[in-house]
Amino acid sequence: MKRILLVLAALFIGLGSVSAKKRKEVKSDLVGVWQQAGTVDGKLQARPILKIIDADGTFSTMFVYSGNTSGRMTQLGTYKIMNDSIYKETITNHFIRSQEGMTVPIKYRFADDGKEVLILEFENGAGKAVFREMWLRISAKGIAK
């Protein structure tokens, strides 16, 4: 399963790089491939959701179906880092069409010194609920060049 996720992540990063317009490169610890995680019975468990934050200022989120290699893009957009704890995502494409065009300020912090665990907090569009997400960096260590 992890191998499939790494291959899919590499594929989408490569496709994004080829098709992306020339943009100013973003230098940030946010850049990378992230897998959503949560706790189940007190244990950390990865979920089949990937977020790719690219250095060209774009991001994408996808759901990977269990048991096969297909998946579904759930959202695409751009992001802008406001400061060392807030960035904004602007959603350009979303599987829920009413989300398209929204700009969402997101609080972020790293839960560890190695910057491998990312915590995101944001409000829903109506401002009535705060969502908190945990993301684990997918490492490319050990992959031969």
Give the ranges of each region predicted by the language model:
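Lipid interaction determinants
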Residues: 6, 15-74, 88-145
